[in-house]
């Protein structure tokens, strides 16, 4: 790896890359992406990456604002057993980013792939080079991550060298218990902050296990077999993946040797109580379940677990070291054992040094500090328990409001998606946006093949009334083909809510920020009636 990074560094120097230059990468989760990042960081240049499955406009909206000097890209990628050639997309990006002084093409799909006017990866890495790291100030930009961009141009979130190093050393060494001899895996793409955290495993001397492809191809057992094959110590996935394995009836421990896995990390959405039980019963009771919550904004977790902290079903075990987490009510008072806004009352090292193109800091202050002066509001509903663990209830801007009682969406999804007849769901309260005095609580369902709404609806009404409350029972259940999701797989609760409240769909959501933009059509049609 050191030799490859040295070669990439030498190649970037030949292309004129220096301190402060932006190098953008349309690369999958592969060793070349890891080496390229390390080479860019060694020069004091600024890294930014997107997954090659992002659409042209989604990538352009992110990369173009950085005015990059070099683009690193693949000819294509494979997903779910299919090949996708993205050279047309690469060329379109080159045409729309006039600041580019060079484009490097990595033949990933086809060894003979070419694109006129580009430098081949083999040319970039042809000459050996020493691996030197240029000294930079503590807050010098390391990389630019992005907000989801569902309601406008994605915000470029700039994080600094020093803050990321301090934060990731703490998280990986102390919370994840990683170090020499440990093997760290997280299923991610280069377009999600978990890739940035994953590669930081090298800092603590761990072996990083990288995987490119679908977690469900050829079946949901793929990642579990990967863990067994490579002796993964810390196995990281998203909560929806755990829930999918649970609903599919998988029991990895019955077919594979799962003794290597000491901890399972889960993030991206709240992990349900049933999800916790499934890990214990189907993967192994020796596995510490580490449910985590944080954000791209800080490229880490505020709430997570630790080797010396108890695990409670459905809860995040503790606040992260150095994270001054609290729950605030509407008046800005701290509350315990009540649901409130998740806030940070003191700085964390990896907080953004800035937003890109925000010279006076006004957009950054508006994003985090507008509600509680001097206090970071993250936008999640959280309850701190009396034993100092935490429960996440979903995004606070997608709150359900029934009879003046506020409810998060996470509990709702746990019950609804606990049904083996439901593949996915979305719940929206139109009253909250003032769409009408008699707004509705709507539940959109993606049914599994063979299931019918007529059969499912009575069961769900009964389950929600029994397991949550009568207030949680929707006014209507509506079957749809798909739930709109962001490029990183998050449910688009707020954009759908805005569309149903009468906001112009073009103002409510950027289609290019969605993984499945056509899924919006039924919601738009419903709003027009």
Segments and roles (model prediction):
Residues 165-183, 193-233, 248-249:
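Conserved AMP-binding/adenylation subdomain of ANL enzymes
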Residues 174, 211, 262-389, 395-399, ...:
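Conserved AMP-binding/adenylate-forming
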Residues 50-75, 90, 228, 235, ...:
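AMP-binding/adenylate-forming catalytic core of the ANL superfamily
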Residues 1-38, 55-60, 116, 120-123, ...:
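Conserved AMP-binding/adenylate-forming core of the ANL superfamily
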Residues 28, 70-89, 110, 212-216, ...:
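Adenylate-forming
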Residues 9, 22, 28-49, 53-56, ...:
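A short helix-loop-beta submotif of the ANL/AMP-binding
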Residues 42-123, 238-239:
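Structural core segment of the AMP-binding/adenylate-forming
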Residues 104-105, 117-146, 153, 161-168, ...:
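Conserved pre-ATP/AMP-binding loop-to-beta segment of ANL
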């Amino acid at each position: 790896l050191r030799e490859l990074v040295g070669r990439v560094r030498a190649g970037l120097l030949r292309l004129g890359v220096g301190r402060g230059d932006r190098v953008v990468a349309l690369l999958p989760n592969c060793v070349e992406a890891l080496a390229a990042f390390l080479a860019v960081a060694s020069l004091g240049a600024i890294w930014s990456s997107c997954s090659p499955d992002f659409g042209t406009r989604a990538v352009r909206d992110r990369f173009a604002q950085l005015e990059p000097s070099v683009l690193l890209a693949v000819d294509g990628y494979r997903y779910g057993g299919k090949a996708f050639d993205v050279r047309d997309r690469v060329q379109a990006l080159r045409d729309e980013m006039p600041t580019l002084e060079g484009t490097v093409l990595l033949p990933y799909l086809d060894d003979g792939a070419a694109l006129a006017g580009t430098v081949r990866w083999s040319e970039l890495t042809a000459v050996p080079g020493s691996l030197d790291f240029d000294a930079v100030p503590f807050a010098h930009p390391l990389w630019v991550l992005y907000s989801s961009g569902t309601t406008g141009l994605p915000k470029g979130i700039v994080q600094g060298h020093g803050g990321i190093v301090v934060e990731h050393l703490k998280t990986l060494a102390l919370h994840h218990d990683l170090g020499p001899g440990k093997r760290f895996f997280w299923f991610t793409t280069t377009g999600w902050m978990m890739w940035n955290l994953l590669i930081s495993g090298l800092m603590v001397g761990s072996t990083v296990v990288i995987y490119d492809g679908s977690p469900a191809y050829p079946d949901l057992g793929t990642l579990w077999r990967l863990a067994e094959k490579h002796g993964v110590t810390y196995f990281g996935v998203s909560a929806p993946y755990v829930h999918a394995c649970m609903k599919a009836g998988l029991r990895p421990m019955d077919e594979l040797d799962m003794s290597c896995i000491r901890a399972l990390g889960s993030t991206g959405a709240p992990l349900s109580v049933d999800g916790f039980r499934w890990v214990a019963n189907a993967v192994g009771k020796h596995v510490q379940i580490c449910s985590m919550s944080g954000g791209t904004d800080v490229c880490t977790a505020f709430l997570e677990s630790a080797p010396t902290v108890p695990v409670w079903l459905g809860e995040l075990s503790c606040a992260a070291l150095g994270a001054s987490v609290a729950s605030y009510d509407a008046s800005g008072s701290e509350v315990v054992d009540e649901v409130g806004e998740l806030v940070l009352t003191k700085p964390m090292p990896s907080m953004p040094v800035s937003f890109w193109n925000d010279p006076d800091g006004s957009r950054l202050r508006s994003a985090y500090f507008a509600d509680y002066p001097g206090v970071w509001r993250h936008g999640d509903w959280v309850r701190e328990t009396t034993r100092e663990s935490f429960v996440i209830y979903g995004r606070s801007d997608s709150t359900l409001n029934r009879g003046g009682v506020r409810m998060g969406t996470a509990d709702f999804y746990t019950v609804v998606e606990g049904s083996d007849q439901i593949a996915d769901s979305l719940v929206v309260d139109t009253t909250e946006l003032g769409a009408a005095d008699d707004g509705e609580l709507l539940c959109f369902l993606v049914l599994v093949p063979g299931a019918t709404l007529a059969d499912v609806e009575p069961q769900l009404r009964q389950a929600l009334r029994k397991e949550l409350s009568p207030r949680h029972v929707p006014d209507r259940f509506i079957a749809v083909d798909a739930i709109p999701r962001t490029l990183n797989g998050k449910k688009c609760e707020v954009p759908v809510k805005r569309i149903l409240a009468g906001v112009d769909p073009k103002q409510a959501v950027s289609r290019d920020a969605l993984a499945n933009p056509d899924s919006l059509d039924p919601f738009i049609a419903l709003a027009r009636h």
